[in-house]
Amino acid sequence: MDLSRINTWKSKQLKSFLSSKDAFKADVHGHSALYYAIADNNVRLVCTLLNAGALKNLLENEFPLHQAATLEDTKIVKILLFSGLDDSQFDDKGNTALYYAVDSGNMQTVKLFVKKNWRLMFYGKTGWKTSFYHAVMLNDVSIVSYFLSEIPSTFDLAILLSCIHITIKNGHVDMMILLLDYMTSTNTNNSLLFIPDIKLAIDNKDIEMLQALFKYDINIYSANLENVLLDDAEIAKMIIEKHVEYKSDSYTKDLDIVKNNKLDEIISKNKELRLMYVNCVKKN
């Protein structure tokens, strides 16, 4: 039996098929009638199959809500949700339906799921399987921006730092700016932002990323800076400029980490670094 052309069947042929014992069995390609109806975005056929009992006879390897989430049109997703399918269900790959909406860039479908349950963006069998992390990996700034706008409270810092790590690693500056804007807006510790992966941007000599990072009050003292200051003049200048800014700013100059660090000692021992420091002080 081949159901791949079921969307072209006449009503009489379809009615005969639905009354047969094979109505909900897999065809020669391993798919059900519902699979082909969704693949063709055939809303009428989907409704007919649902009324005939398709959801009570799903194949083990088919996840209709996940499949429908890849469609640009949201009608079938709405119908399946109304029919009682669980939006938090994992498929055989450990993903939710929202994950596939993100993967396809379907913003309207993404909004449909998130409005129903914003926590879905953090559902996944592992942290790497969540829809939020997937959107970051895809560098989809629009979807991540929407996700952040729908979170009613702050979320796990470890998740945020993991996302910042992969963003810096991949050189996605706009995504990093979006995440740091959120991190800054929710920072209530009155301290410099701790970004462990600043060293990664330095090692990659990603000047554009570093320039973006240094627009924020980040902790530049968390990395071992001695070798960097001595090996790369351009990056050394950026670090020293930020250090001088912190020492001059009324908000940051009294922070312990600004007053007590090894940076001044490293600078004092090197003529070129001292000159950079003096020039930065004059400009500040």
Swiss-Prot record:
Subcellular location field: Host cytoplasm; Host nucleus
Keywords: ANK repeat, Early protein, Host cytoplasm, Host nucleus, Host-virus interaction, Inhibition of host innate immune response by virus, Inhibition of host NF-kappa-B by virus, Repeat, Viral immunoevasion
Ranges of the ANK repeats in the UniProt entry: 29-58, 60-89, 93-122, 127-157, 159-188, 193-222
InterPro entries: Ankyrin_rpt, Ankyrin_rpt-contain_sf
GO biological process: symbiont-mediated suppression of host innate immune response; symbiont-mediated suppression of host NF-kappaB cascade
A single cellular component GO annotation: host cell cytoplasm
Induction of the gene: Expressed in the early phase of the viral replicative cycle.
Domain of life per record: Viruses
Xref: PROSITE patterns: ANK_REP_REGION, ANK_REPEAT
Pfam families with a match to the protein in the record: Ank_2 (PF12796)
Protein family membership: Belongs to the orthopoxvirus OPG039 family.
PANTHER family in the record: ANKYRIN REPEAT AND PROTEIN KINASE DOMAIN-CONTAINING PROTEIN, ANKYRIN REPEAT-CONTAINING PROTEIN-RELATED
Biological function: Inhibits antiviral activity induced by type I interferons. Does not block signal transduction of IFN, but is important to counter the host antiviral state induced by a pre-treatment with IFN. Plays a role in the inhibition of host NF-kappa-B activation by preventing the acetylation of the RELA/p65 subunit of NF-kappaB.
Name of the protein in its database record: Interferon antagonist OPG040
